[in-house]
Amino acid sequence: MLINPTDSDAVGNSILMANKANIPVITLDRAANKGEVVSHVASDNRMGGKMAADYIAQKTGSESKVIQLEGISGTSAARERGEGFNTGAKEHKFNLLASQPADFDRTKGLNVMQNLLTAHPAVQAVFAQNDEMALGALRALQTAGRTDVLVVGFDGTNDGIKAVEGGKLGATIAQRPDQIGIVGVQIADKVLKGEKVDSTVPVELELVVKQ
């Protein structure tokens, strides 16, 4: 069984039921917090977070004043992207002014960014753990006339890529959902054949910037 969980906690009961029925489970994109899975296929979120930090350092220099907008607390995506970004932030000696949740939501991204901008007007760059929050933050910055602040998103959604191509969003770390699906089916095929599979299979990401 291949599952792409929208909620890492809620999916647990379904996986436990599959475990009882001896049905092998493979999770895609987001990990489950309960139950046993034979393999988890997902973007290398830690690497993506680090890529975002590296890009910010490249554009604004080390020791930059940065704000991070976090995803939904407890999700593997938010945790791993945050860990990767924080690793890069330490490496580049960023001054992390604030790191607050906006729950992967565009409207919350806008509201949280408005508040953080008031509290930290010296901000030079924003890393949002998904494109929705990045676009919300972008709107808040535009409204405040702060087009000097670099914003980097994550996921490579259609809206995110459009904003990058329009010169509004600095960059987005693009997931490759087609590749996650392809690898997931390949792993399922191996499981059905009784072959050994890795417990975690990372899928590479791509930095999307304006050409």
Write out the residue ranges for each language-model feature.
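Hydrophobic alpha-helical
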Residues: 2-19, 85, 98, 102-162
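Extracytoplasmic/periplasmic mature domains of Sec-exported, cell-envelope-associated bacterial proteins
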Residues: 3-4, 19, 24, 28, ...
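Flexible loop/hinge segments that line or gate small-molecule binding clefts
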Residues: 8-47, 58, 65, 157-165, ...
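Loop/turn elements at helix/coil->beta-strand transitions in domains of secreted/extracellular proteins
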Residues: 20-25, 62-65, 91-96, 121-124, ...
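Hydrophobic alpha-helical segments within soluble ligand-binding/sensing domains
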Residues: 41-66, 108-110, 157-160, 175-193
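Short beta-strand->loop
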Residues: 42, 67-76, 101-103
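Short, solvent-exposed amphipathic alpha-helices that sit
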Residues: 48-55, 76-94, 108, 112, ...
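Hinge/cleft segment of the Venus flytrap/periplasmic-binding protein
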Residues: 69, 73-77, 87-89, 176-211
